[in-house]
Amino acid sequence: MVAKILDGKQIAKDYRQGLQNQVEALKEKGFTPKLSVILVGNDGASQSYVRSKKKAAEKIGMISEIVHLEETATEEEVLNELNRLNNDDSVSGILVQVPLPKQVSEQKILEAINPDKDVDGFHPINIGKLYIDEQTFVPCTPLGIMEILKHADIDLEGKNAVVIGRSHIVGQPVSKLLLQKNASVTILHSRSKDMASYLKDADVIVSAVGKPGLVTKDVVKEGAVIIDVGNTPDENGKLKGDVDYDAVKEIAGAITPVPGGVGPLTITMVLNNTLLAEKMRRGIDS
């Protein structure tokens, strides 16, 4: 069998059209969602990613701004800027682009974001709400993964789902979202023994560790659904996923490519959460 290719670009395009329609409806009520992104320093990849978010937000009718601070900015300066945005009533959602320079504590900054404007979903309050099944803002990559599975009409109930990676950004939250859909979830990580035995029994594999070629054809069950979150640049700058794509697609039931799989949905869910933040503060039901 040859796998169904889960085209993240097309799924994102369709989803963003729905978001654009909702933004237009909000504007008719006199409200325009605004996304503010804090960028500290001049890291090329971060600058590119921030520009992509701004462009995507504006394309669906939102307002977006980049607050660019110098690489030498102190933690206090970043916190002051963040506090200004927290108190700015025109701002619906805030995100802080990571990584941050070494003099700035990432955790301290993330905890200083107003939880009601935390469109990345990384504030401890929002993480906690996810774990008691009362989530509002969910981290964007896990949310995007669930949209891909939903779009592909993958029934997760009772399925064996294996998540490789235990980060707070992807691995742990996506495991919780899969549990909410009644999947039986196993989390594997760098200390796990005999990973192959778990993978061979998996109906769904989500790999998010950044190790190209980690998931090979011999450990994938025929018909399994493969979600590849890896995006490691090779020596030529070409992005590689965690999955041996060309081989695994010959046996899998469905698979995401890299690039063009999960990535487009991550930015889309930033927009989704920004819209949600605006609706919540205006008392408008989603």
UniProtKB/Swiss-Prot annotation:
InterPro entries: Aminoacid_DH-like_N_sf (IPR046346), NAD(P)-bd_dom_sf (IPR036291), THF_DH/CycHdrlase (IPR000672), THF_DH/CycHdrlase_cat_dom (IPR020630), THF_DH/CycHdrlase_NAD-bd_dom (IPR020631). Transmembrane segments: none annotated. One of its GO terms (cellular component) is cytosol. Pathway: One-carbon metabolism; tetrahydrofolate interconversion. One of its GO terms (molecular function) is methylenetetrahydrofolate dehydrogenase (NADP+) activity. Its EC number is 1.5.1.5, 3.5.4.9. Keywords: Amino-acid biosynthesis, Histidine biosynthesis, Hydrolase, Methionine biosynthesis, Multifunctional enzyme, NADP, One-carbon metabolism, Oxidoreductase, Purine biosynthesis. The keyword Plastid does not apply. One of its GO terms (biological process) is L-histidine biosynthetic process. It catalyses: (6R)-5,10-methylene-5,6,7,8-tetrahydrofolate + NADP(+) = (6R)-5,10-methenyltetrahydrofolate + NADPH; (6R)-5,10-methenyltetrahydrofolate + H2O = (6R)-10-formyltetrahydrofolate + H(+). The keyword Oxidoreductase applies. It holds the Pfam family THF_DHG_CYH. Belongs to the tetrahydrofolate dehydrogenase/cyclohydrolase family. Catalyzes the oxidation of 5,10-methylenetetrahydrofolate to 5,10-methenyltetrahydrofolate and then the hydrolysis of 5,10-methenyltetrahydrofolate to 10-formyltetrahydrofolate. Homodimer. This is Bifunctional protein FolD. The lineage of its organism: Bacteria, Bacillati, Bacillota, Bacilli, Bacillales. The gene is folD.
